[in-house]
UniProtKB/Swiss-Prot annotation:
It comes from Mus musculus. This is Uncharacterized protein C11orf91 homolog. Residues 1-21, 73-97 are annotated as: Disordered. Pfam families: DUF5529 (PF17669). Residues 73-96 have a biased composition (Pro residues). Signal peptide: none annotated.
């Protein structure tokens, strides 16, 4: 009997508990003294079969899977699509060209063109350059100005430096753009009302 242990050895205390039946995580290594490869979840879920139809040695015992008598398979079923050797994997079909024929123009969805018959017809034709596209840059420019103004305000808050002349210039430019946008919309509304 080795030193440091008191009393007689109990056979129940010397045995380790059986591995858990749930999926082990990386932190459950203390339960068993087996190597890390025994904790591979995929080895426990999918027990590889030998050519004779019996589970591979060691894997079934570690996984706690009982080996049932299996009839020798007549033919091995093919792997699911996308699995198997790279030479046997089918290439995915190319993207159908008919699905992406609509041009991607997110601003057309969020920004309605000014009213007018020539604008309505030309806005539906893809690739046409109209004054509407020039007016669509106003919201983009306003957004860019707002972003620059917010950046300057953040620099003021963090104390990294503040350029008051640039801030005043950007504010004046933003106000000028807003006034120009309002003026371009007001004549269209007054003409449609009269």
């Amino acid at each position: 009997m080795p030193k440091g242990r008191r009393g007689s050895q109990n056979p129940k205390m010397s045995q380790r508990p059986a591995p858990p039946l749930y999926f082990p995580s990386l932190y459950d290594r203390g339960i068993s003294s087996s190597p890390l490869s025994d904790f591979n979840i995929w080895k426990k879920l999918f027990v590889p079969l030998k050519a004779g139809g019996t589970p591979a040695a060691g894997v079934a015992g570690v996984a706690g899977v009982r080996s049932l008598p299996l009839a020798p398979p007549a033919t091995v079923p093919p792997p699911p699509p996308g699995l198997g050797p790279p030479s046997e994997r089918p290439c995915p079909p190319p993207w159908p060209s008919g699905l992406a024929s609509i041009p991607y123009e997110p601003l057309r969805f969020f920004y309605s063109p000014p009213p007018g018959p020539e604008m309505a017809t030309s806005a539906l034709v893809p690739g046409s350059t109209t004054p509407w596209l020039a007016s669509a840059s106003h919201p983009e420019e306003l957004c860019e100005l707002e972003i620059r103004i917010k950046e300057l305000e953040l620099l003021t808050i963090t104390g990294d430096g503040f350029d008051s002349q640039r801030y005043k210039f950007l504010k004046a430019l933003k106000d000028e753009k807003l006034q120009g946008l309002k003026m371009s919309r007001q004549p269209g509304k007054s003409a449609s009302c009269s």
